[in-house]
């Protein structure tokens, strides 16, 4: 029996959106993505205790300063979890920069270099890592610098066409346009509470971005993210990559209904437009209330979970 997950794999690279090693073993994705919220959830699992202990021991060996120890411990823990995942997936792990650095280009660049150095020290080459950065103007500029250094980036919390365009123009390796969080916003801010997959605002957003990239010949990979239901996933079959939570991977694996490719650009490739200026980026992005609110909210939520992780690690230091 061919499952929907099998069919999806034939047209899209399937990525696991989790830090749960058992789930990754079960669904055998090509890549895996993590974020501060997923690291926090994974850290509560008993099998991760040795990774926490090792991160704490590493931090204590680096510095006697408590504040620095905390920074080193959280960076090392994120990398330790990434290293465990890389034992299972054949492709890449996405590890996220502290969301509190989202508006600081230089600090983001420095944090990314540090995370890469930790992976390199453990014998992992750059071609197996993606550094996740929020798709702010400053984050996109940081990614532009990092890409030139051979550090590939995954630009996340992407909700607007302006963000997507700026990422492509910066030569970013991969973007993660969010689907479910866009749907959440429209449900909360309009009278319409139910959407068929084809009319889902998040699905429409990713489809537009995918077609724009192909139309203008951008090499940036489009990886749809943040799904609320299987319908959103099947409606984006054919997207370059999709990062999917274990519960939805399970649904796809248990369903054998035929899957039809929905995304495929067959038109001509056009000449690229002039890159957006900073002023144009902000005008276009800020013209979309949903994108403004969800980007800010996403950064706040990741920062809150980063702080919870720090509280947990502080007790160990």
Curated annotation (Swiss-Prot):
HAMAP family assigned: Transaldolase_1
A GO cellular component entry from the record: cytosol
Reaction(s) catalysed (UniProt annotation): D-sedoheptulose 7-phosphate + D-glyceraldehyde 3-phosphate = D-erythrose 4-phosphate + beta-D-fructose 6-phosphate
Pathway entry: Carbohydrate degradation; pentose phosphate pathway; D-glyceraldehyde 3-phosphate and beta-D-fructose 6-phosphate from D-ribose 5-phosphate and D-xylulose 5-phosphate (non-oxidative stage): step 2/3
EC numbers: 2.2.1.2
Subcellular location: Cytoplasm
Enzyme class: transferase
SUPFAM superfamilies the record matches: Aldolase (SSF51569)
GO molecular function, one term: transaldolase activity
Functional description taken from the UniProt entry: Transaldolase is important for the balance of metabolites in the pentose-phosphate pathway.
Active site: 132 (schiff-base intermediate with substrate)
Subunit note: Homodimer.
Keyword terms of this UniProt record: Cytoplasm, Pentose shunt, Schiff base, Transferase
Top-level taxon: Bacteria
Species, as recorded: Haemophilus influenzae (strain PittEE)
Name of the protein in its database record: Transaldolase
One of the GO BP terms on file: pentose-phosphate shunt
